Amino acid sequence: LIHKTFEGLAERGRCSMGWFFGFKLHLIINDKGEILNFMFTPGNVDDREPLKQGRFLENIKGKLCADKGYIGQALFENLFLNGIQLVTKVKNNMRNSLMSIADKILLRKRALIETVNDELKNIAQIEHSRHRSFSNFIANSLSAIAAYCFFE
C-alpha cells in the first residue's frame, strides 16, 4: 500500500538503523531547540543535498552543527563562502584537525538535535506508515511540526 501511495515520491534509503522506504526530514534548529527550517527529501537523497540549496539556509549565519554524514570539503567551502561555519566531529579515517574548545563544546549540542527528533517521533508521532495519500502525509507532518512549536 505504501508503495502505491508514495509512488514516484518516496525512495528506499539507508540510515543507522538499516534500510527504510520513505522520506528524510532535515531540520535546522537554534540553540534553544526551536525549529528554524525543515525540508523533506526522498530517502535516497544524500544528507548534504539540502545544504547545497540556498533557500534551506536562508537567513542562517554563524556556526552550523552537524553529524558526520554532512562532512564534505566542497560543502564546507560553499557554506564558508556564505558565512556559515560547518562544525562536525571527525570521522575515524580522517586526519585529526585542530578544533577550538568552543567548537568541541558546541558539538555537545548534538544531543539537543536528537532530542528534537525524538520528540517529533514519539510525542508528535511524525513517524508512522498509515498514510493513505500524500496530502495526508504532508498534513500529519506539518501538524506535528506545528505542535512541536508549542511543546515546553
Where are these regions (language model features)?
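Polybasic low-complexity intrinsically disordered regions
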Residues: 1-92, 145
